[in-house]
């Protein structure tokens, strides 16, 4: 019966996941239908605008060239008409002079003939006909205004839609996730020398499968990539996966996005559990600050809260959500998990296997600071490193500066400069807890033991503050040092 019930649960889970997948695909199809309508309308409007622009250019060219013909015709007509008028006047003058000469010649016996002949001779000398050029000032040839648009017509007939680059193909085998960096490699399915650049988009997600259309996280965009690979650096992996897609662009248009891919981004992500903190510690997500008045203020707030009563969380609020299997449930509201001189706060996520890494930066002026791990059984009054349930590195700046490793009330003084940022690497199954200078990755100390219970990140501070960085992968340099045995074995013999 139990097996059938379990099998039915699996079927229900499978069907629910499949239904969600189909619903997401239906939503995608509906969105694509809307996009087809909107995009086709847009490209149609763009096409009409481009042709209208061509028509306008052709019309402007036509008007300009017609104006040139009209101006040339008017100029030549003016010159020829002026020349024609001058020739007509010269001809009339010449004909009058010819008639006078004929008449004078017929009256040779008259006494005034010599004088008349002399006047005719002088008139011929001054006649316009003999000063007139009989060559046309302009030509009637208009061949310089002829056109032949055969080549342009062929170009217009060759008009077509812009060539769109193919969608790239992301090469998962060559892509890499390491050191909180992602190197994405892709290739083009065919050779295209006209590609100008690529556009890469990525987003975070907690879903392993194909990227879903509905996501809370927006796509982040990186433009102007010239190579077929790109490395994203300095990422914080606060979700389990990342989606990636890339498209190619020429100087005119962008192609389709590649098939999106999902890469796992394993990292240790936790928050500081304010319900576990000492009342003198003011906790804000991943930051902690010592507050000398914290206890008194807390007592006042508690009394006010008791007087007003409590309000239940809404049914659908996160407060009623199912916690992660490794996420610790919230503790008591009175913030008395640690008290007296145990100025401690714990992380909210259990470590029960695998390798994990996180970093913490503390205020150098803090009088005391400690970082490490602890079992959940760590007592209210117990300080980090003073019982068998906790391991830590401790910095003391009060009265006398000391830098020590502590476990089970045993102390080892560390001969190393105190960094302002510490890296913590926990390999649960190997029983290794190593501390590093977060900047140089120099090993400061390594505990070698056998963890018998799940662990929690643990911190302590007195008269100071610190900031935790999570969502980090185990650095490659740390893995390399561990494999090469760089962590000194002799430093652990007194602290196991």
Swiss-Prot record:
* Ranges that cross the membrane: none
Q: Which UniProt keywords apply?
A: Cell cycle, Cell division, Coiled coil, Cytoplasm, Cytoskeleton, Methylation, Microtubule, Mitosis, Nucleus
Do you know which CDD domains this protein is assigned to?
A: FN3, SPRY_PRY_FSD1
The entry's localization annotation reads: Cytoplasm, Cytoskeleton, Microtubule organizing center, Centrosome; Nucleus; Cytoplasm; Cleavage furrow
* Gene3D superfamilies per UniProt: 1.20.5.170, 2.60.120.920, Immunoglobulins
Q: Residues in domain COS?
A: 105-162
InterPro entries registered for this protein in UniProt: B30.2/SPRY, B30.2/SPRY_sf, Bbox_C, ConA-like_dom_sf, COS_domain, E3_ligase_FN3/SPRY, FN3_dom, FN3_sf
Cellular compartments per GO CC = centrosome; cleavage furrow; cytoplasm; microtubule; nucleus
Task: Give one Pfam family.
Answer: fn3
GO MF term (any one): microtubule binding
User: Which spans of this chain does the record mark as coiled coil?
Assistant: 4-99
- Domain Fibronectin type-III span(s) in chain numbering: 164-268
Can you cite a GO biological process for this protein? cell division
Q: Where is this region: Disordered?
A: 301-336
> Any idea where the B30.2/SPRY domain is?
268-477
Cell cycle among the record's keywords? yes
Q: What is its main location?
A: cytoplasm
The record's subunit annotation is: Oligomerization is required for binding to microtubules.
Q: What is known of its domains?
A: B30.2 box contains a microtubule-binding site.
Per the entry, what this protein does is:
May be involved in microtubule organization and stabilization.
What protein is this chain from?
Fibronectin type III and SPRY domain-containing protein 1
Q: Which organism is it from?
A: Macaca fascicularis
**What are the top taxonomic ranks of the organism?**
Eukaryota, Metazoa, Chordata, Craniata, Vertebrata
């Amino acid at each position: 019966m139990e097996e059938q019930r379990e099998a039915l649960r699996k079927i229900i889970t499978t069907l629910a996941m499949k239904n969600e997948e189909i619903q997401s695909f239906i939503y995608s199809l509906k969105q694509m239908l809307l996009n087809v309508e909107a995009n086709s309308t847009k490209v149609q409007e763009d096409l009409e605008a481009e042709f209208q622009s061509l028509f306008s250019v052709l019309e402007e060219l036509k008007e300009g060239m017609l104006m040139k013909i009209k101006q040339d015709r008017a100029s030549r007509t003016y010159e020829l008409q002026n020349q024609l008028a001058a020739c007509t006047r010269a001809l009339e003058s010449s004909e009058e002079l010819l008639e006078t000469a004929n008449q004078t010649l017929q009256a040779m016996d008259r006494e005034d003939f010599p004088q008349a002949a002399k006047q005719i001779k002088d008139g011929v000398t001054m006649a316009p006909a003999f000063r007139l050029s009989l060559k046309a000032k302009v030509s009637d040839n208009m061949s310089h205004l002829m056109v032949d648009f055969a080549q342009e017509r062929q170009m217009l007939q060759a008009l077509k839609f812009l060539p769109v680059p193919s969608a790239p193909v992301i090469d998962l085998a060559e892509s890499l996730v390491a050191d909180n960096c992602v190197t994405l490699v892709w290739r083009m399915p065919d050779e295209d020398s006209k590609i100008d650049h690529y556009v890469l988009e990525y987003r975070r997600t907690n879903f392993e499968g194909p990227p879903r259309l509905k996501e809370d996280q927006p796509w982040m965009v990186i433009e102007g990539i010239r190579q077929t690979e790109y490395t994203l650096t300095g990422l914080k992996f606060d979700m389990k996966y990342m989606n990636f897609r890339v498209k190619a662009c020429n100087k005119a248009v962008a192609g389709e996005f590649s098939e999106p891919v999902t890469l796992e981004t394993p990292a240790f992500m936790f928050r500081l559990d304010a319900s576990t903190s000492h009342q003198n510690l003011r906790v804000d997500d991943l930051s902690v600050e010592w507050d000398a008045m914290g206890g008194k203020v807390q007592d006042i707030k508690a009394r006010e809260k008791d007087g007003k009563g409590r309000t239940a969380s809404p049914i659908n609020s996160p407060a009623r959500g199912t916690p992660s299997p490794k996420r610790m449930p919230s503790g008591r509201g009175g913030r008395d998990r640690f008290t007296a001189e145990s100025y401690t706060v714990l992380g909210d996520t259990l470590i029960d296997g695998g390798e994990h890494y996180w970093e913490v930066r503390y205020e150098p002026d803090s009088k005391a600071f400690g970082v490490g791990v602890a079992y959940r059984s760590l007592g209210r009054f117990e300080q980090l490193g003073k019982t068998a349930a906790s391991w830590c590195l401790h910095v003391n700046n009060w009265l006398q500066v000391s830098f020590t490793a502590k476990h089970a009330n045993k102390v080892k003084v560390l001969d190393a400069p105190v960094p302002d940022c510490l890296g913590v690497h926990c390999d649960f199954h190997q029983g290794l807890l190593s501390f590093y200078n977060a900047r140089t990755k120099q090993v400061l100390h390594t505990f070698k033991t056998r963890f018998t219970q799940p662990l929690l990140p643990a911190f302590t501070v007195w008269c100071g503050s610190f900031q935790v960085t999570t969502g980090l992968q185990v650095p490659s340099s740390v893995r390399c040092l561990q494999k090469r045995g760089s962590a000194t074995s002799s430093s652990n013999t007194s602290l196991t």
